[in-house]
């Protein structure tokens, strides 16, 4: 049932859905060009655009100061150096330490270094001494070059700017992440996502945007 609700929700929002033939295909860049560059970085999104994606995905979570940032998880410890920069600012959830984006300001988050995804033994976490293990060893090396977290607004401006300079018309594919968690923390992430989309002109079914959420209660709002 949740999958059906999600499908219906996306179908209603899909631009010009009835105009696509059965043989048409859409290329949706999942987390950007995440097989080549660290996921959800501006570099990964620019590369996905250059590779010819029709839509580019944005997973969205909120910061302590109510900004939308592009992250697959609502925590930071899988893709950044947050553990060494803020070793004490974690929450323990089911016996596991997690550094949640909602506990940091945008400025603090954008000061972190972003990497290809990794895992770490929980017993080794603390003081920046943990041994990171790449989740996908053949992808971009861990903590090489310089990448950071960016806002939803920054990514929209990148895509709209490239649309203008290239003459293409590439769409957005935002996902509202963990709305239940944000509500528990007193934040209405869905309302903020809709506000930002409206700010940048995405207001009708004909606009090039999919809006997705895997929480059926949230889609019914």
Model-based region annotation:
Residues 3-15:
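Bacterial N-terminal signal peptides
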Residues 17-221:
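Phosphate-group recognition and catalysis centered on beta-loop-alpha active-site segments
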């Amino acid at each position: 049932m949740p999958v059906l609700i999600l499908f219906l929700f996306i179908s209603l929002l899909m631009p010009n859905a009835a105009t696509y033939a059965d043989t048409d295909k859409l290329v949706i860049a999942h987390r950007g060009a995440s097989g080549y560059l660290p996921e959800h970085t501006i570099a990964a999104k620019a590369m996905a655009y250059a590779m010819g994606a029709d839509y580019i995905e944005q997973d969205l979570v909120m910061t302590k100061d109510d900004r939308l940032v592009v992250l697959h998880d609502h925590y930071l410890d899988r893709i950044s150096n947050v553990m060494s920069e803020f070793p004490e600012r974690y929450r323990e959830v089911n016996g596991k330490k997690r550094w949640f984006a909602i506990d940091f300001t945008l400025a603090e988050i954008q000061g972190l270094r972003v990497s290809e995804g990794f895992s770490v033994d929980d017993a080794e976490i603390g003081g920046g001494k943990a041994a990171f293990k790449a989740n996908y060893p053949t992808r971009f090396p861990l903590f090489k070059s310089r990448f950071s977290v960016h806002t939803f607004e920054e990514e929209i401006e990148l895509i709209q700017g490239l649309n203008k300079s290239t003459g293409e018309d590439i769409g957005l594919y935002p996902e509202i992440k963990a709305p239940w968690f944000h509500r528990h923390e007193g934040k209405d992430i869905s309302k903020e996502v809709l506000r930002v989309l409206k700010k940048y002109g995405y207001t009708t079914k004909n606009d090039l945007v999919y809006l997705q959420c895997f929480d059926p209660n949230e889609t019914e709002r």
